[in-house]
Every structure is written in structure tokens, then in C-alpha cells.
Amino acid sequence: MEESKKGSGLTAEKSKALAAALAQIEKQFGKGSIMRLGDGEAVEDIQVVSTGSLGLDIALGVGGLPRGRVVEIYGPESSGKTTLTLQVIAEMQKLGGTAAFIDAEHALDVQYASKLGVNVPELLISQPDTGEQALEIVDALVRSGSIDMIVIDSVAALVPKAEIEGEMGDALPGLQARLMSQALRKLTGTIKRTNCLVIFINQIRMKIGVMFGNPETTTGGNALKFYSSVRLDIRRIGSIKKNDEVIGNETRVKVVKNKVSPPFREAIFDILYGEGISRQGEIIDLGVQAKIVDKAGAWYSYSGEKIGQGKDNAREFLRENPEIAREIENRIRESLGVAAMPQGAGSEAEIMDEEE
């Protein structure tokens, strides 16, 4: 009996000490600096922005890329890294958000971005001279609290000032890795606070002397791997042909890391030259998988009505009838437990129809 009284006394003392500590922390660092997870506001719904690919939104588990987080997209050359990020920018702009593009590679094709649905006059662009300058610009934009999304293209092009000012053969090991590590330590908290999505595009390098395992690695050290909430590995796996002409690439994206949903899922979609991700093609493929769209031989039909013979014709039908495409997409999302597409994030064809 005495022991139980003693135990309850200690518990009461601990509770009082904890309450005093929490009050002191809140007084020193502000309200909300520490809280219990059950207090309501601690757990928030993750806000997302669509990737422009229905399959990838589903593979990410939350319906898109999470805001207030760092995302890394990496892959070989011409695999669709920049195309994917430009599609995300277009989706963010459709929701009324402001986006910035830090073009460290000095290679952004403005006409191509416009074709993908990016509102180019509203896009903020910077072409910095050094890695330090690029990351300082990112820091200033994030701290302003008025930017919804920033893309850095690419980590490999963030060249430290010392390297630019030095001689061609100078050995400066670990300089870029230290720069990235310092920048991410500084940025992460602000990114979360301002709910800004920051996407780093990265390139692949080969590790020398690797006999077993994967010899591929990404540039810029290990910091980005740790600080990223989502890491996407994008690869070109085939070509899309119309008669004998190659009109696009078949692309696979693997979710290598995901802190907001189970990882290791993947999505396969088409990237058409001059158009970007073929959302209509994905709706057809995923609709057939979910048994929402019927396929008999070469014919595709929806709700008993034929929508086209062959994938190209069915894709064209959905492009001309965006309301049917939206209906099928929302049914696919519903069947897979992913949030329905918001009204503002219409397809490109729908927006063009409205403008006309």
C-alpha cells in the first residue's frame, strides 16, 4: 500500500516537473514549440501537389509530393527529370501557387516549359554563378514565406566558389558535399515552417572499383539522402512509336525513399515529346487495371460506350472530353484510396478549352 502511494507521489511529482519544463520551453521558444501528439494541432494532414502523373501520385501514397519537405529526383541523362519537375510546377501554378526555378545548369528551355503547361511569365527563374549563390537565393526565397515551390536543377551544377576561382586541376575533395550539408541543415526547419516544397534534381555517377552491388551513386554527398522526405529514381525503359516514328519515352519512376507513406512502389508512364507526361494514357492503363475501363481486343469502352480503337484513339477521345477523363481519374483514385483531384488542378486540355 505504501509502495503504491509512493509510486503515485512520484508520478505526480514527475507530471508537475514535466508541466513546468513544457511551460518554460513554450515561454522561451514560443507557443507550439513542443506539444503532445494527441493535442489536435500536432498532427496535420499532409498537403500535397500532384506530380502530373496519376500513377506516380498513387505510388507516393498521399496523392502527390508533400509540401514543407525536401524531395530528390535523380536518374541518368534524358530520363525525364526536368520534365517531371516542370509538370509539378504546372500543377502548383494551377492551384494558385508561386514557383521558382534555380537553373544552375543554365539549360532551361522556356518554350518546352510552356508546352508542358507552365505559366512562364509567372515563373521566377534564377541562373546563379556559384553553388553558394544558388543556395543563398533558395534560403532567401524560403524565408520570405511567399514561395510555394522551388526547383534546383541540378545538384551536380552547384559548383563551390573556391572551385570556380581555382585552377582547372586543383583537388578540392568534399567541398560540394560540405556545402550541401551546411545548406540543408539551415534550410530544413524553414522549409517546414513555410510549407514550401523544395525539389533537388540530381545526376548519377559511377563509383570506381565496385565489384559487387550497385556502382551508381548521386552527387553532392550523403546529406541530401538523409534530409529528403521523398527520393525518386527516374529511368527511361523504352520508346513509344507511332508507325516508324518515335514519339516519346516509356518511363519508370521508383519511390526509393518515402517518409510520408510506404516506400518502394513504382509507376510506369509515357512521356510524349513536346507534350510531357501523357495523363490520358495513364488514365486508360490504370482504368483497365482497376476494371473501370473495359478493353475488348483493341477497343476501349467506359460505362458501356466505346471511347476508341487502340490506345492512341482512346487517348485522343479523353483529351477532347476532359470531364470524362476527370470522372475516370477520380474513380481510379477512389478505388485506390487516394484523394480525388482538386477542382483547380484540371488537365491541360481542359484549361486550353476554357481559354478558348
UniProtKB/Swiss-Prot annotation:
Among PROSITE patterns, the record links this protein to:
RECA_1, RECA_2, RECA_3
A Gene Ontology MF term for this entry? ATP-dependent DNA damage sensor activity
**Alphabetized UniProt keyword annotations:** ATP-binding, Cytoplasm, DNA damage, DNA recombination, DNA repair, DNA-binding, Nucleotide-binding, SOS response
Major subcellular site: cytoplasm
Enumerate the subcellular locations listed in this protein's record, separating them with semicolons: Cytoplasm
Q: Which residues bind ATP?
A: 75-82
GO CC terms = cytosol
Q: Which InterPro entries match?
A: AAA+_ATPase, DNA_recomb/repair_RecA, DNA_recomb/repair_RecA_CS, P-loop_NTPase, RecA-like_C, RecA-like_N, RecA_ATP-bd, RecA_C_sf
Q: Which GO terms of type biological process are on file?
A: DNA recombination; DNA repair; SOS response
Give the similarity note: Belongs to the RecA family.
Q: What does this protein do?
A: Can catalyze the hydrolysis of ATP in the presence of single-stranded DNA, the ATP-dependent uptake of single-stranded DNA by duplex DNA, and the ATP-dependent hybridization of homologous single-stranded DNAs. It interacts with LexA causing its activation and leading to its autocatalytic cleavage.
According to UniProt, the name of this protein is: Protein RecA
The protein's gene is named: recA
